Amino acid sequence: MRQSGRKSNQLRPISLELSPLINAEGSCLIKIGNTHVMCSATCETTVPPFLRGQNQGWITAEYGMLPGSTSQRIKREAALGKQGGRTQEIQRLIGRAMRCVIDVRKLGERQIIIDCDVINADGGTRTAAITGSYVALHLAIRSLMKKRVLKVNPLISQIAAISCGIYKGEAILDLDYLEDSDADVDSNFVFAGNGNLIEVQGTAEKNPFSEEQFLAMLKLAKGGAAELFKLQNQVLLGS
């Protein structure tokens, strides 16, 4: 039995608040249990040097955690003078994931920057960031099309992400911090809207895990992603 009382295939309570930031083209505050992440999408009329003159755009991402987002204060990376390896890994993951669901050729020479700021961390911050970032990106594209900055919708697919793990010998969905810190296996799954995989991250913390255990986690993750896609559609269609 999970300490939270949740079933093995049960997500934490989820909410998606649209457009909490008034200046970004698109923004979303995602809450999954006690993990809260502010996601925004901002358009700039510049592209990285390697894309100049090619009439296509780019999507990149930045990720950070507020000092008070965890039980012990995190030092600001700006004050330290450099980003940590975990931060770089996560923001590259978010950028890669977003580029899989948008046709950058339809952006023209524009760059969309996804910003993910963790307000409260209780496990699954990177997966929450991806799920919330899609909503922010969708709203940004909608805004750019309404302003006629973009003539064609470049979005190809939805995207959502969720964590799974092996905890006390059982495959479970959407780990909170206590589960994650004591899990035998910790994994993250990123899905496109059609159920195809965009990225899988999986690590054995203690002992190697079997193919059977991996498939059990994959099954749970697909079910969780389906719920996330449904919620994304509900809030976006209602806005």
Curated annotation (Swiss-Prot):
Keywords, ordered alphabetically: Nucleotidyltransferase, RNA-binding, rRNA processing, Transferase, tRNA processing, tRNA-binding
Keyword DNA-binding applies: no
Reactions the enzyme catalyzes: tRNA(n+1) + phosphate = tRNA(n) + a ribonucleoside 5'-diphosphate
Assembly with partners or alone: Homohexameric ring arranged as a trimer of dimers.
Enzyme Commission number(s) from the entry: 2.7.7.56
PROSITE patterns from the UniProt entry: RIBONUCLEASE_PH (PS01277)
EC main group: transferase
Taxonomic path: Bacteria, Pseudomonadati, Pseudomonadota, Alphaproteobacteria, Rickettsiales
Residues involved in phosphate binding: 86, 124-126
Gene: rph
Name of the protein this chain belongs to: Ribonuclease PH
The UniProt record lists the keyword tRNA-binding: yes
UniProt family annotation: Belongs to the RNase PH family.
Gene3D superfamilies in the record: GHMP Kinase, N-terminal domain (3.30.230.70)
Family matches, as InterPro entries: ExoRNase_PH_dom1, ExoRNase_PH_dom2, ExoRNase_PH_dom2_sf, PNPase/RNase_PH_dom_sf, Ribosomal_Su5_D2-typ_SF, RNase_PH, RNase_PH_bac-type, RNase_PH_CS
Role summary: Phosphorolytic 3'-5' exoribonuclease that plays an important role in tRNA 3'-end maturation. Removes nucleotide residues following the 3'-CCA terminus of tRNAs; can also add nucleotides to the ends of RNA molecules by using nucleoside diphosphates as substrates, but this may not be physiologically important. Probably plays a role in initiation of 16S rRNA degradation (leading to ribosome degradation) during starvation.
GO biological process: rRNA catabolic process; rRNA processing; tRNA processing
GO molecular function: 3'-5'-RNA exonuclease activity; tRNA binding; tRNA nucleotidyltransferase activity
